[in-house]
Amino acid sequence: MRDCVRGPKARAIGRGLILSACPLFLGSCNNGSTQTPPPVSVTLTPARGLVVTQSITLAASVANDSQGLGVTWSATGGAFTNQAATTAVYTAPPTAGTFTITATSKADTTKGASATFGVTDLAGVFTWHNDLARTGQNLQEFALTPSFVTTAMFGKLFSCAVDGAVYVQPLWVANLTLNGAKRNVIFAATQHDSVYAFDADANPCTMLWRANLLDPAHGGTAGETPVPSSGGGALVGNGFGDINPEVGVTGTPVIDPASGAFYVVSKSVIASPTPPVFFQRLHALDLATGNEKLSGPVAIAASVAGTGDGSSGSTLSFDAQSQNQRPGLALFGGNVYIAWASHEDTFPYHGWVLAYNAANLTLPPAVFNTTPNGGLGGIWMSAAAPAFDTSGNMYFATGNGSFNGSDEFGDSILKLEGPSGGTLPLLDYFTPFNQASLSAIDGDLGAGGSVVLPDPTTGTHRQLLVQVGKDGTIYLLDRSNLGKYCDPNPPSNCLSDTQIVQELPNALNGMWGTPAYWNGTLYFGGAQIGGTSGDSLKAFSFSADASGQFLLSTSPTSMSLHVFNFSGPTPSVSANGTSNGIVWVLDNSQYGPPTPNGSGPTVLHAYDATNLANELWNSAQAANNRDLAGNAVKFTVPTVANGKVYVGTRTELDVYGLLPN
């Protein structure tokens, strides 16, 4: 017997692929007698994957090719060069799509093997929930399909260690040049005031750079630390430890791919000697190095005229200690938008929005305050970033606070214009008729984030926005006329919000998150605080009624069998346009301490977007904890890009994708 059993060979050349086939055959044996050889077979590895840089390595093995004829290579897109009997260089096409490479045996043309690859034109996930409308959809995902996202083919690939809890959504950039080489990069920031850049694909994890936002090169001064936030040494909050054990970077940063800037807000303190000195700074980091751009960070400071909580005379100033930079940052029209709420409702606090010139952070920001002559009205939205329409109008919701419909806007949805004369002019608002009741029971409308929906082509109301808060009511609003306030007291005597497009009371048990939109459907991740009961992930259709007006279905079109306890999920959707939709959510209920559900790993779930009752996969299914994630952080959102899913946890960034085959 003669063996020719060799390992598959493959190496990348430039932007192309080297594919190799190793012939295996069984010759004569048993004293010269001839044995009928087994049939030819071809194996191609890997059989699935994704290409962004147009370069990947494949290998083919041909069993029982006694004459060594090799294979014929073909593809549904792209080109081959340097073809030999068992090797070829493949260059993927520059256009996005899904492509199949086939190796066909020359000895038996009925035998072959194929590999399916996607070429994505996704440039990056630069902002919270994927886009300025906050739809949470990535429509340029070609590798992750419902048929591939199974326990057999999808799972945890690797983890990247970090120095603190990751409350931010990881951000992803394609084909970034670092140290002379192009690579995909995933960025994460921690509550220890660190920012990391990792190779998004390298296994084991490869750190490209780390920025310590408290060192002198990033504007820090001697003795600065992240702010202690739990236990007897807490310097913010009321002792609940909602952000535990420290506060550093909380709001999701935002990336400007044109300038190569990574905008992030840090929080820190010099605790001794007393009284403590608190800092919040806006940084613009270089994507390639982590170094400061624009001559370093700027200390955040602002004031407005007002006599509200914490004011001095007739001036209300920004307080770096009490204001919690909870929402994600936003970038629009050359301005970086930042919003704040409180630490555990610790007085005094207000809702602040500042807009900085993205090219010159030293210029005074434009300012808006939600309650300048009252109190509260924080902007937190369970980590959501403010939403924008294509005209540059900004939308966000506030929490409990003073309300009068004039200059105090607790439990309201606000529409602001871009910077003008140092301010952010208020254009419109909506406040539920039961605002006073919501405020009395801590029923923040602003526990959820706003989503700007695609504009329908029919109906009276064609510029729509959706919002949910703690009480689980879904509000569908006309962005051109949000509806303001329908007073329950005489003479209006309002018992509901009849002035808006649609209201669905008790549609969810409650929501601490933001819905996602895809292909005529909205996905809501409900929950109920306290941990004793929760809610399913629910889908509501968004379509035209008989009059042509686009509305939500009055009941879910599908829902998950799994029930999510507090804090509930914010869904993200991956799809190839209108096909292969997958809804991704994190079960962060074990985000403690403190939590009624204890401490434990976050669980990543994947659902068929056309039927949420069909769960495709979750990270708790595989044997031997193969896909186990790090411990949970509440309100976090998965990032889906280039065939991978990135999840921030308390100690690591976990990376999921198609398993080697």
Roles of regions detected by a PLM:
Residues 97-106:
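A short beta-strand micro-motif common to beta-rich folds, especially ectodomain repeats
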Residues 59-65:
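Acidic, Ser/Thr
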Residues 66-77, 113-114:
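Short, well-ordered beta-strand segments
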Residues 23-43, 114-116:
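Bacterial Sec-dependent N-terminal signal peptides
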Residues 121-418, 424-456, 462-486, 512-530, ...:
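Mobile, glycine-rich extracellular loop/lid and propeptide segments
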Residues 74-89:
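Low-complexity "stalk/linker" and mucin-like segments enriched in Ser/Thr/Pro/Ala/Gly
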Residues 48-54:
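Short, solvent-exposed loop/linker segments at the N-terminal edge
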Residues 106-113:
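Short, exposed coil/turn segments at beta-strand boundaries within extracellular/luminal domains
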